[in-house]
Amino acid sequence: QAGNFVSPDDATFKAAAAGADWSKTFYQVLTDEPGKDAWPITGATFVLLQKTQDKPAQGAAVMKFFDWAFTNGDKAAAELDYVSLPDALKAQIRKQWAEVKDASGKTVAFK
């Protein structure tokens, strides 16, 4: 989009993810993101978590796993040729987890 020649690598994929506006929704099509270093064809993998959990212990386990992955998984992701999420996005996702409730409306805690 900026007219620069970029190579498909971790840095240009991260630049595409960093250029997305994640503030309104986590659903993003990362094609042709702005930024002089952004690779133009980048994709994201999504995990859906129900806001109302009928099995809160399982929902808590899912959040605990992703919390661990966000904290400890960047190196393993890179070794498998995946690109980790930007730190600001990880923080935004963690904040959103406060909206996950059980059937009675109580927040599902995972720590």
What is each PLM-predicted segment?
Residues 77-78:
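A short acidic/glycine-rich loop-to-helix N-cap element
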Residues 1-72, 82-111:
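Flexible, solvent-exposed loop/hinge segments that line or gate ligand/substrate-binding clefts
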